[in-house]
Amino acid sequence: MSQMNVEQFASELGVLPTVLLEQLQAAGVRKHMTEDSLTEKDKTQLLEYLRKIHGAKEEKGRISLPRRQTSEIKKADSTGKPRSIQVEVRKKRVFVKGVDLPVERKTAEIPAPAAPSVPPVRTPVIDAAQQALRQEEARRQAELIARQAAELREKRLRERPPVVEIKEPEEPAPPFVPAAPVAGPEAVPVAPETPSAAPGETVAAVEAEAAPSQPASTEGTLHKPAVKPEEKADKKKKPAKQVVWKEEKVEKRGLKTRGDLSGAKGGWRARKDKHGRTEEPAPHAFSAPTEPVVHEVLVPETISVGALAQKMSIKAAEVIKALMKMGNMVTINQMLDQETAMIVVEELGHVAKYAALDSPESFLADTEIAPSELKMEARAPVVTVMGHVDHGKTSLLDYIRRTRVASGEAGGITQHIGAYHVETERGMVTFLDTPGHEAFTAMRARGAKVTDLVILVVAADDGVMPQTVEAIHHAKAGKVPIVVAMTKIDKPEANPERIRQELVTQEVVPEDWGGETMFVEVSAKTGQGIDDLLESVLLQAEVLELKAPKDAPAKGIVIESRLDKGRGPVATMLVQSGTLKRGDILLAGAAYGRVRAMLDESGKQVEQAGPSIPVEIQGLSEVPVAGESVVALTDERKAREIALFRQGKFRDVKLAKQQAAKLENVFEQRGEVKVLSLIIKADVQGSYEALTHALQQLSTDEVKVNIIHSGVGAITESDINLALASKAVVIGFNSRADAVARKLINSAGVDVRYYSIIYEAVDEIKAALSGMMAPERKENITGLLEIREVFRISKVGAVAGCLVQEGFVRRGSLVRVIRNGQVIHTGELDSLKRFKDDVKEVRAGFECGLSLKNFNDIQVGDQLETYEIQVIARTL
């Protein structure tokens, strides 16, 4: 290898040449110029110096064994749910080569021989070359042992060496020559001019101290001398080398008993190690608690019995036992509601706390933009048209659409869309058609103010009807202003003043009379007052100052939804704020999906929709519920997570309420309470509400009326299928079944009853419930007989000759045998004869012969009492 100078070596190390010169001089290398050459010995000397000043140690003859141990623990999070945590324990053990053992020996005390004294040896059998080679090897081994002894002594002064179990070598270790041997500062020098016999004696002396059982090596022989028997015995006493992990040592002591406070010793004397020190127990040793442990249990909205037991660190059987004492029959996987779970926790002596709702829906609140940060713009009013049937509501809407929608779009309007918008000279108006008011009721129940105005349609020739009053109640409950449209004003029998008077009784006062409600007279046939109606709506909207942000994520509500055979789930959505674009990710209740197609009320494709614009969207995962709120998100994965969470939450809450088998429902579960299931369809909402209320009043402790479904309209195929599944009776009040439903009724044999008078329906249902009730049984005594004679006949048995004292006796009558005033038998007559003829009946004052079925213990003087059971039907 070519030598390099100081400057080249400094550039290779990345340091300044002047700094390298200072380090070389401090290490004892005499170099003064950057052009001076460096040898391998100089580099090694510099390396040893740097190791010494930095505290580095040579790692010779060491083996490091890393060890990893993975385990899994379960810990409850902030919501109370158990979470699995992976725990990894890393350990490292270092083993030193056995030649490093004699650390207590002081190499400096090894006496140097004054004169070579060669012990007597056998006659050499090898040549001189081999003998010289063997002596050279022994000399190298002596130098190595001396050097290692010095290094170990130096290390012992620096730090305490680790304690390891090492087997002492039985024979000298093979020669180990380092790559660049450097003598330590305290190493014993070995003179090169020592006579050839001295190295052998030095090796023998060192080995005699380190391992006395090993005899001195004999020079000039090819075989090892025999070991003496006593030396073999000494070797057997020494244990073999073992690699032992401290963490795996098992303490074989007495079992720790409950209540023992002796520091986990269990009353046994601790074992001592080879140095006389008492071994301490493992820090993770289990000690049984001496008093009950009270846990703080976080209870979520719903939790299973097994999970609740795990939180309290008890068995699930204990929780089930506590619930059974409270009257709940549950299983280990059954869901409990929060209130029940907290009562159980308190009953078992733990502390129950409401768990923080770990709901993905919190993501919606975090991502919601504050209204103050958004730019608010004016939006069109949303108007709902309400009114009684046949009051001209449909005609009014058709006239507005026909005159205010472009002629090219008039034929393309899809009638099933329940919302559309109209352009006027003063702005746009969005109309919301909610037949039956079902969607409006669902929206108001969810607290969503969808409608800004209500147009109340009242026929001028008919007056205020029940559904009109119902519409007024809906509007007042939602705190929505009303504009009254009096239709059919062109008819001769129209009477607007009567309409005003009737509406005043419902607290709807016109402006002419000092109120706040605008009244407009319109005619859907001639078009009279249509412009005034739209003008009134827009004027009322200006007073309300309707505003909504446009440049924001879309929010809205589901108006209608259905399942289309060709397009899948389809929902009509009203955008309330923001802008809905094609491709946005929507979340509607438990449904989610990407907007794949968006249509307006004309059936045309649109790319975006602003506030107060109704659109029909496709691409949701399922059919959403009418009245559900819709929000646009940016992350489809988060939308799916929230939707699945809502589905699971709804299912868990439903199961927790349904599965709880209370003790008070035991009789009903055993079938002792009979249930009559009904499906009611009526022409108007008021009719089925009144009929439902009247029928539910018929329920008693023995029979119960269960209204499975009630609605407005004709009896459909779905109603018949529901009746088949639930074994219910279908009642049509001023309503008939359609053609498809009639075919299913005839084929399946479903009981369908039609009524037009509410009292007829109530009377028939009452009669049906009376037939389901258990009848009343009444006992009537028919006759009294006295036994005058008893005849014993071998084939027949005992036959009694009797006299009828009162009433009459019939064949097959029920009879009691009375002896000394006590009833000894209750049974039935087997035969009845007068003289030798069988008779059906014997009246008072006549004698007869009779025998009892399965009873022969009759005596003279006994009395027979005949009776019959009368069944009386019960009524409500």
Curated annotation (Swiss-Prot):
Residues 378-547 form the tr-type G domain. GTP binds at residues 387-394, 433-437, 487-490. Residues 179-219 have a biased composition (Low complexity). Residues 412-416 are annotated as: G2. Residues 244-259 have a biased composition (Basic and acidic residues). One of its GO terms (molecular function) is guanosine tetraphosphate binding. Keywords: Cytoplasm, GTP-binding, Initiation factor, Nucleotide-binding, Protein biosynthesis. The keyword Protein biosynthesis applies. Its main location: cytoplasm. Residues 523-525 are annotated as: G5. Residues 433-436 are annotated as: G3. Residues 387-394 are annotated as: G1. Residues 164-288 are annotated as: Disordered. Residues 487-490 are annotated as: G4. InterPro entries: DNA-bd_dom_put_sf, EF-G-like_DII, EFTu-like_2, IF2_assoc_dom_bac, IF2_II, IF2_N, P-loop_NTPase, Small_GTP-bd. GO terms for cellular component: cytosol. It is found in: Cytoplasm. It comes from the Bacteria. HAMAP family: IF_2_B (MF_00100_B). Belongs to the TRAFAC class translation factor GTPase superfamily. Classic translation factor GTPase family. IF-2 subfamily. NCBIfam families: IF-2, small_GTP. PANTHER family: TR-TYPE G DOMAIN-CONTAINING PROTEIN, TRANSLATION INITIATION FACTOR IF-2-RELATED. One of the essential components for the initiation of protein synthesis. Protects formylmethionyl-tRNA from spontaneous hydrolysis and promotes its binding to the 30S ribosomal subunits. Also involved in the hydrolysis of GTP during the formation of the 70S ribosomal complex. This is Translation initiation factor IF-2.
